[in-house]
């Protein structure tokens, strides 16, 4: 039954990304990628291979909508690979977290650190792979920072609504 709930969350996040957040582009610098909320909030007790497979699946779906060849998939797989490492470093008893990761299950500060780190890494990979050059690295970094801030506003705002 839990997997049906997770599938529903995934569909909701992807529909919102494609229909709403895909249309929000501020001056060509801000591209909120809120779909990573699903990957960040996956249960902490998932096997790593399952988490990475889910990340690849989510990334492929987003790549189809954005017409990007593997960019989002690579960034989502990297996020899915790094998330358990980050959780084990931030949360002392991460094995006890069987539900979705949120501020309620791991703590507010730990969740914010996790969300900020994973969002920045994901966005940096997306924009660096899209640029495919280090010639204008500062533009990639600026776009990463601005888009990460917008994405984090939505992610942390959503999480603050949970009770």
Predicted ranges, named:
Residues 1-163:
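Terminal, non-globular segments
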């Amino acid at each position: 039954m839990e997997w049906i709930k997770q599938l529903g969350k995934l569909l909701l996040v992807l529909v919102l990304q494609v229909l709403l957040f895909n249309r929000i582009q501020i001056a060509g610098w801000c591209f909120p990628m809120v779909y990573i909320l699903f990957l960040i909030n996956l249960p902490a007790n998932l096997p790593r291979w399952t988490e990475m497979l889910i990340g690849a699946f989510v990334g492929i779906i987003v790549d189809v909508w954005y017409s990007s060849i593997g960019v989002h998939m690579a960034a989502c797989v990297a996020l899915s690979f790094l998330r358990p490492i980050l959780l084990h470093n931030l949360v002392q008893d991460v094995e006890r977290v069987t539900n979705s990761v949120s501020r309620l299950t791991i703590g507010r500060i730990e969740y914010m650190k996790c969300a900020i780190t994973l969002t920045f890494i994901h966005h940096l990979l997306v924009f660096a792979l899209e640029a495919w050059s280090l010639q204008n690295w500062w533009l990639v970094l600026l776009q990463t920072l601005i888009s990460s801030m917008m994405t984090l506003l939505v992610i942390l705002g959503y999480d603050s609504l949970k009770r």
